Amino acid sequence: MGLRCDITLSITLVSPFLMPGLDVAALGIDAAALRDDCGKGCPIIPADQVKGLLSAACTTLAEAGVEIDGVAVTRTLIGRLFGRPSDEDGGEWGAPQRGAIIFGDLTAPPQIFGDLTAPPQKAASFTRVSIDGSTGAAKNGALQTVELVAPLGQRVTFSGTATVRFDPRTMPAPATKTAAEWVAALLHTALGVIPAVGGLKTAGFGQVAEASATMTHAE
């Protein structure tokens, strides 16, 4: 019998951070923030990025031999939860494995800083420059202006829901938790090994201050 549960995901980032969007924010802005399309201008971490981050983090847990409530995190389990290509790990060609988890976007409050199309926005950007390693001077034409959706140093919480649909008979039996609780615990643990989110991470953007996964509904 199939089960369904909802897990609330929450990631708090420290500004500056950037999930790059395609919109033109304002004249002179080279990298604009990705926002929702519901008319509220909420910054988001897109669902596919959330899935990719958590899948990679779970793989890290598997490689480290982590167990959660007596159940080892394995690539087979990760494949069941996140899906995998048809030709991966001996799978049948042309028959990809669908993932049990459906992720939604993680959304931050709207208009933290307002968007750059609504002035005044004097502090809503951050300027970067590339340095020539041989001369120590700024490279010609290597100035980048990045949109900020929150003041530097401010913590911004992105939250959303992941829906899990699975047959508990396909999951190992945890020692004390239900299968749904185990999946929530896995995602919570995986969030804890993600140091940064978004673009420009090597420049110090997207630091994760805290993150959590909590089961909110099961049926």
In which residue ranges do the predicted regions lie?
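RNA-binding basic/glycine-rich loop and surface signature characteristic of RAMP-family CRISPR effectors
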Residues: 1-219
